[in-house]
Amino acid sequence: MRLSRRRNGFGPLDKAVAIVVPLVLIAVGVVVYLLLRPEDCPGGLGKHGGECVGVTESAFDGDEDLDGLIRAVADENARVERAWEDPEQGQAPMPYGRIALMMPFTSDEASAMTAAMIRRALAGAHAAQLKANSSGGPHYQLLLAPDGKDLDQWRPVVDDLTALVDDRRSPLVGVMGLPSSTPETRDAMKELSARRIATVGPVITSADMNAAYFFKTSPNNSMFVDALGHYLKRNPGDRKGFLVYDSRPDDVYSRNLHRLLQKKFGKAYGLRQRSASYLGSTGPAAGIPQRFQSAAQKICLTESDTVFFAGRDQDLPALVKRLSQESSCDRRSPVRILKVGIGLEPTLTTDELTGMLRETRTRIVAAASVTPAWWTPRGLPAKGAPAGLGGFLRVFHDLDERYGIGEKPLDDGYAIMYHDAFTLLSNAYDRSYSEANEKPGSDDRTPAPARTPTKDDVYNTLINAGIVERDGRLLCTNCLQGAAGTYAFEQSPETHQWPICKPIPVIEYPAQGRGGPGKTYRTFEDTFAYPCP
């Protein structure tokens, strides 16, 4: 038997194989990885500044607590598209429009929105979407438009939104969100307005956040301060005031509120002589935030009974805690902290903070868009609640049971105000669609194909939902019957697209138990001869 002799070393063919085979394996591995790897930015979003931003109707990765809600919105969006593209047998295609929710979907400790705020805002917008889609058409997709946790990646988002406005089949109805009064939000607001896209800010309150196409469902800081003025006329206290303000120069909200409080109450409450600043926690690193030791000492040494707070709600618990630790305070005299905002942040009503407030005889007085007094402990509308609250509560409670929106999910007002912002746009599109497809004369046939309103039609409908006077009273013309009240908008240099006749309740926490804050202030009511409807 002849045995083969083993060669010693590599020949030319061996060397070629040794080189080619690893290269082929590497190439195959790269292809497999590219095919199977998770997308950098799912849902068609793009990577900008290290974050996934853009506009999508599909699911993507936000904060972990948002996963269920984001998937729910994506599923509803897919259902809406199927009802138009491939309706069930025997059903006519259901036309639909698109409303974009432009805000962060991720957060960190310095973000403009906390994770809890984002969750409540998304739940409110989705509740409005479900409510709108439960009735006759048109129906709506809720596009998700993440613009970065610091709101600074808005440019590619605005470009993506602009590309949707000329879609005649399923047009962009408008944009909602822009959740914080920052320089970045102001730039985004102005750019959307320049492109003539109707935009609604659900929780914008800085009085100088104005542009022709920018509508606000919340009152602004000036209106909140006026509501506090009405409260103080009834409850003046000892007029020994003190102003605590956020010193960040780039915080549009806090700077605007600081100026307004000084202007309104500076002389009567001695705020020019008694004030202290602190560094707010929202924004880039600039030192140690929430240092309230100096403010607390000065409040106690001056025996101030009325503290005006010009800062964000995230920082207020730290002030309350520092005041409770201040040994120089005379606990015999009550102190009240006056603030403005969308509602009552749950961090202000924890058992721990409530105990501190009671022990130190301190009370928070808040002029707000929303008050917990509007609903009962069982989650039903209370006496005197806005007409549109009940329908929202029914849908929202179902979402809360399924996805767990969080503790006291209504109290800060975000869910309610985001609901109203979506509803404002969907109502305007509904009316524009109906008018565009009115049946001429006695013809009861719908025009075929149905006419689709443009973004300009939606804007013109929005600015004509106003208040008129008749027979000694005021009447609404297409007012929004929102979960936060019945209010209107009109094109006027006086109103700047801020809500007309929006209620501003004043909240006392812990509650006094008697008396109460008095009559509810309504925006622009003093410009009319008769009470708001």
What are these regions (language model features)?
Residues 405-412, 426-516, 531:
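Segments of small-molecule ligand-sensing domains
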Residues 42-156, 417:
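N-terminal extracellular/periplasmic Venus flytrap/periplasmic-binding protein-like
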Residues 214-283, 305-306:
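An alpha-beta-alpha
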Residues 326-420, 437:
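Extracellular/periplasmic periplasmic-binding protein-like sensory domains
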Residues 1-98, 473, 479, 501, ...:
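Long terminal accessory regions outside catalytic cores
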Residues 165-180, 197-202, 242-246, 299-319, ...:
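Periplasmic-binding protein-like
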Residues 116-120, 135-208, 497-498:
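Beta-alpha junction/loop-to-helix N-cap segments that form part of ligand/metal-binding clefts
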